[in-house]
């Protein structure tokens, strides 16, 4: 019995040590992701906004961008590039960002405008709209950290390659944009069943492509994206 007790204590200690090590590793990761922000604070900037988008590649639905200003030195456990966060944790981290953020703006550009101007320009428009949504909020950005994009706007900015994995502010924008768009696609799934929008978010999965063949194109499909584009041509040229 005494041996069993000692083993139990040893296991508990090892488990606690692992938890402490994991917490330290997470603290170091988050600290590293604040390197851009800390350098800008030293330069005198006060309100640094991270900007990112979600939805450039899907065959259906909008492109969504978010602009998020976090308090100085704010750390949110688990916050990372939204593609690296388990889907089961998206909502929890999204809510944590909403609670801690000083300001949040969201820009949504629908599939029709994407078809008109192309996805690259539509992404820029979504980002600019997200920034515009901050107007009227108490905190206004004096610097922008943008994921791999440069914007035509009179605010100091820096484009960061893989910014959502290297800047906590951009990562915050990434999860806000991701959850916002996923919620929209889940709603579209109820309106247009048979394409699996709630699961695939409009990307060209097997289920989505089968839905296109079985039911045709919906009003939210991007007609400038293949294979939707070819299907449009086929329907106009019987």
From Swiss-Prot:
EC number: 3.1.26.4
Reactions it catalyzes: Endonucleolytic cleavage to 5'-phosphomonoester
Pfam families for the chain: RNase_HII
HAMAP family hit by this protein: RNase_HII_B
UniProt GO molecular function: manganese ion binding; RNA binding; RNA-DNA hybrid ribonuclease activity
Record SUPFAM superfamilies: Ribonuclease H-like (SSF53098)
Role description: Endonuclease that specifically degrades the RNA of RNA-DNA hybrids.
CDD domains linked to this entry: RNase_HII_bacteria_HII_like (cd07182)
Organism, as annotated: Streptococcus pyogenes serotype M28 (strain MGAS6180)
Source domain of life: Bacteria
Cofactor annotation remark: Manganese or magnesium. Binds 1 divalent metal ion per monomer in the absence of substrate. May bind a second metal ion after substrate binding.
Principal subcellular localization: cytoplasm
Stated name of the protein: Ribonuclease HII
Binding-site residues for a divalent metal cation, renumbered to this chain: 52-53, 147
PANTHER family named in the record: RIBONUCLEASE H2 SUBUNIT A, RIBONUCLEASE HII
């Amino acid at each position: 019995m005494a041996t069993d007790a000692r083993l139990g204590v040893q296991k508990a200690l090892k488990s606690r040590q692992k938890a402490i090590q994991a917490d330290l590793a997470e603290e170091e990761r988050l600290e590293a992701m604040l390197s851009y922000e800390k350098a800008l604070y030293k330069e005198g900037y006060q309100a640094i906004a991270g900007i990112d988008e979600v939805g450039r590649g899907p065959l259906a639905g909008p492109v969504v961008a978010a602009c998020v200003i976090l308090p100085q030195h704010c750390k949110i456990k688990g916050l990372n590039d939204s593609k690296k966060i388990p889907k089961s944790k998206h909502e929890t981290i999204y809510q944590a960002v909403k609670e801690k953020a000083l300001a949040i703006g969201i820009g949504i550009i629908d599939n029709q405008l994407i078809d008109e101007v192309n996805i690259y320009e539509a992404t820029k428009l979504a980002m600019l709209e997200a920034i515009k949504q901050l107007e009227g909020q108490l905190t206004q950005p004096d610097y922008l950290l943008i994921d791999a994009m440069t914007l035509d706007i009179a605010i100091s900015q820096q484009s960061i390659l893989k910014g959502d994995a290297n800047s906590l502010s951009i990562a915050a924008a990434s999860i806000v944009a991701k959850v916002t768009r996923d919620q929209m696609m889940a709603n579209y799934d109820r309106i247009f069943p048979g394409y699996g929008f709630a699961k695939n978010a409009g990307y060209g999965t097997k289920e989505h492509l089968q839905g296109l063949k079985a039911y045709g194109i919906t009003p939210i499909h991007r007609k400038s994206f293949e294979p939707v584009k070819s299907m449009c041509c086929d329907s106009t040229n019987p």
